[in-house]
Amino acid sequence: MKIKILFLSDNYPPEVNAPASRTYEHIQHWVKNGAEVTVITCAPNFPQGKVFEGYKNKLFSKTLQDGVTVIRVWSYITANEGFVKRILDYVSYSLTSFFVGLFQGCDIIVATSPQFFTAVSGCLLAIFKRKPWIMEVRDLWPESIKAVSAMKSDSKVFVFLEWIERWLYKRAASIVVVTDTFKEKLVEWGVNADKIHIVK
């Protein structure tokens, strides 16, 4: 019987950034090995924040792309500028992907970050659907926000986001990171090293 994977990523081809390319490569590998994969993403718009020609920012659309069921959901699309606008983009995708994900059959859920709120959606889906979920960590968020001075580490918002992040790490059945440094950092934060896997 085929394993059914539900994958959440706000970047996916035809976008050509690193998250989209990495996600596509992983999914194609799984499909070739017999998995049935459904991706929930949004209308392609990176990096200009403008929907690509031939696509619309609709509430819901479903297509078959290279053997993968691709569901695109509505999100607040904006150029990659301004903290508040980006957060609106992230949160809107998290909400719509969660709602649509509730109606998708699966055996396992994978959610990739950045951005951080995709992982929130994946975790909540896992709780509601009683399925295991894997968190792929490509950036230590909200640490990355602090690194570019977009938010102070002693602010209430940062402390709250950091608490959510640690909660997500504990809830995930497995965590995939892209560097040895990321694994070391998570272990330092108290995450069980046995459930952290490095895939470069």
Residue ranges and their predicted role:
Residues 1-66, 196:
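N-terminal subdomain of nucleotide-sugar transferases
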Residues 5, 108, 126-145:
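Active-site proximal beta-strand in glycosyltransferases
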Residues 10, 113-114, 137-140, 200:
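Histidine-centered beta-alpha loop that forms part of the nucleotide-sugar donor binding/catalytic region
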Residues 39-101:
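A conserved catalytic-core segment of Leloir-type glycosyltransferases
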Residues 41, 132, 154-200:
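Donor nucleotide-sugar binding/catalytic pocket of nucleotide-sugar-dependent glycosyltransferases
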Residues 69-72, 97-118, 131-136:
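Short N-terminal targeting/anchoring amphipathic segment
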Residues 98-99, 105, 117-120, 124-128, ...:
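Membrane-proximal helix-turn-helix segments that form the acceptor-binding/catalytic region
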